[in-house]
From Swiss-Prot:
Single GO MF descriptor: ubiquinol-cytochrome-c reductase activity
Species per Swiss-Prot/TrEMBL record: Cricetomys emini (Emin's giant pouched rat)
Cofactors required: heme b
Cellular component GO terms held in the UniProt record: mitochondrial inner membrane; respiratory chain complex III
Alphabetized Pfam families for the sequence: Cytochrom_B_C (PF00032), Cytochrome_B (PF00033)
Name used for this protein in its record: Cytochrome b
Residues where a ubiquinone binds: H201
Keyword Iron: yes
Family to which the UniProt record says this protein belongs: Belongs to the cytochrome b family.
Length: 380
């Protein structure tokens, strides 16, 4: 008798995706982060669902309802901090996942890469709207500042902002629609993840060498399921430690003050995972220029398949481009630090230099080093 997982229409899909999937035998732990992102997504949807049962999306009661969750609901504080810090874990895994994709040349699988970029934008939008929901000071002012950026769009900007706000300022209609979008977007993300996996399984996984691995594949289960469990345990250990010992480490103290349109916080800043993009936005004195730089900072990922045309897919054997890559990683860390600093000397200058360097490395230095390496290997 044939195994049911190989014959049943539904089980067959799961079998081909997670059990009998032919996987390169040499993929390293950097390939763990895809499954970790799946775990994070499930965790966020579950904790979010329980939070939504007690949350009210009304400006007068939103802040109180979050306080009520933490004080009166059984393990409400735990669910709330799991959700808040789970978002941080999500972005850590997401950035490592994208970084691995750049390092090992995964962007040559164009469809998978482009769906991944759409996923990145969707997750960022979801996280931004989630940050507005507790209706603290930073929630309110963050929403005001970021949505206001759309007013830089010529002709339709102001109308667009008022349409998103549902009035002439961030108020009850804004909070209600942000809650609605924050609830529905994770399910759209799940659908996009399925498309992402569909395209990935069309071509098969990349591997650290960047070479074709068709001659050396092993089944995903039990080898990589076991390997992924280690990553999952480490992720859970780190997340639970954060939730139980330092739940507010990555948050902003200003968000423990109820939203007040009459008092502006001294430093308006988003969550830590958006700080690098926020630093690029702030480093340009012009509003429209800043918005364009902000969007371009992530959209440059779509250019990678066209910019890096080396004969070698992976950076494993390319020391010059490796140097540029780690310069880029360092630069993003500097931008993250700058985004959290006040707008004053020397932070403005450091931010501007780091922003110029960010685009220079991606658009000029890395493609040039790629061409130079090909030249040195007499491949061009």
């Amino acid at each position: 008798m044939t195994n049911i997982r190989k014959t049943h229409p539904l089980m067959k899909i799961i079998n081909h995706s997670f059990i009998d999937l032919p996987t390169p035998s040499n993929i390293s732990s950097w390939w763990n982060f895809g499954s970790l992102l799946g775990i994070c997504l499930v965790l966020q949807i579950l904790t979010g669902l329980f939070l939504a049962m007690h949350y009210t999306s009304d400006t007068t009661t939103a802040f109180s309802s979050v306080t009520h969750i933490c004080r009166d609901v059984n393990y409400g504080w735990f669910i709330r901090y799991l959700h808040a810090n789970g978002a941080s874990m999500f972005f850590i895994c997401l950035y490592i996942h994208v970084g691995r994709g750049i390092y090992y040349g995964s962007f040559t699988s164009m469809e998978t890469w482009n769906v991944g970029i759409i996923l990145l934008f969707t997750v960022m939008a979801t996280a931004f709207m989630g940050y507005v929901l507790p209706w603290g000071q930073m929630s309110f002012w963050g929403a005001t500042v970021i949505t206001n950026l759309l007013s830089a769009i010529p002709y339709i900007g102001t109308t667009l902002v008022e349409w998103i706000w549902g009035g002439f300022s961030v108020d009850k209609p804004t909070l209600t629609r942000f809650f609605a979008f924050h609830f529905i977007l994770p399910f759209i993300i799940v659908a996009l993840v399925m498309v992402h996996l569909l395209f990935l399984h069309e071509t098969g996984s990349n591997n650290p060498t960047g070479l074709n691995s068709n001659a050396d594949k092993i089944p995903f289960h039990p080898y990589y399921t076991t390997k992924d469990i280690l990553g999952v345990l480490l992720l859970i250990l780190f997340l639970i430690s954060l939730v139980l010992f330092a739940p507010d480490l990555l948050g902003d103290p200003d968000n423990y003050t109820p939203a007040n349109p009459l008092i502006t916080p001294p430093h308006i800043k988003p969550e830590w995972y958006f700080l690098f993009a926020y630093a690029i936005l702030r480093s340009i004195p012009n509003k429209l220029g800043g918005v364009l730089a902000l969007i371009t900072s992530i959209l440059t990922l779509t250019l990678l398949p066209y910019l890096y045309t080396s004969k070698l897919r992976s950076l494993m054997f390319r020391p010059l481009t490796q140097l540029c890559y780690w310069m880029l990683v360092s630069d993003i860390m500097i931008l993250t630090w700058i985004g959290a600093q006040p707008v004053e000397y020397p932070f403005i200058t450091i931010g501007q230099v780091a922003s110029i360097l960010y685009f220079t490395i991606i658009i000029i230095l890395m493609p040039m080093s790629t061409m130079l390496e090909d030249k040195m290997l007499n491949w061009n």
